[in-house]
A protein has these predicted regions:
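N-terminal intrinsically disordered, cationic/polar leader segments
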Residues: 21-57, 62-68, 74-114, 119-161
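Sec/Tat signal peptide C-region and signal peptidase I cleavage site
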Residues: 16-20
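Positively charged n-region of N-terminal signal peptides that target proteins for export
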Residues: 1-4
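Bacterial N-terminal signal peptides
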Residues: 6-15
Length: 161
């Protein structure tokens, strides 16, 4: 009987361990230094996401932080979360009106761009997750801080429910 109870407790503990490993930690932290800074300038008419992806490929960037971005756009396309469900629904916004590009932030995770933009004119400020179709008006300048290729940060852009 004692062995049977131990066996049941072991299965119970194994179940808890497996369940715990499947759960995402509340906080994940990695430490790194910047290897270098890349400053990317995109000319008028360039799609911002396409330009970022082109620079990532050309410079062979694996992990990086998008530190800043400025410029102006003729067209924009972004999405924002639109409810509290997991996974959340997305609301997409697309327009063909000029706005100032006041901020670009994000990450390059295992070579994949995840960027957010903020746009403004004299009446409003809008922004969200950068989508294809956001095109530079005068220009766009985006500054990227390159991190170590060894960092395991791709998981930061994934979520579990």
């Amino acid at each position: 009987m004692k062995n049977f109870v131990c066996l049941i407790v072991s299965f119970f503990l194994l179940g808890i361990t497996a369940y715990s490993q499947d759960k995402e930690p509340e906080v994940q932290v990695v430490t790194s230094e910047l290897k270098r800074i890349e400053i990317i300038r995109m000319r008028s008419g360039m799609d911002l996401l396409e330009g970022l992806n082109k620079a990532v490929k050309e410079k062979k960037l694996k992990n990086a932080v998008i530190l800043a971005g400025i410029g102006s756009v003729t067209d924009y396309h972004f999405h924002v979360v639109s409810d509290k469900n997991l996974p959340p629904a997305n609301q997409f916004t697309k327009a063909s009106v000029p706005k100032d590009l006041t901020s670009v932030q994000g990450y390059i995770l295992n070579g994949r761009v995840h960027a957010h933009i903020t746009l403004a004119d004299e009446n409003s400020v809008v922004g969200g997750h950068l989508e294809p179709g956001t095109k530079a008006l005068t220009f766009a300048i985006i500054t990227i801080g390159v991190l170590s290729d060894e960092l395991e940060i791709e998981r930061f852009d994934k979520y579990k429910f």
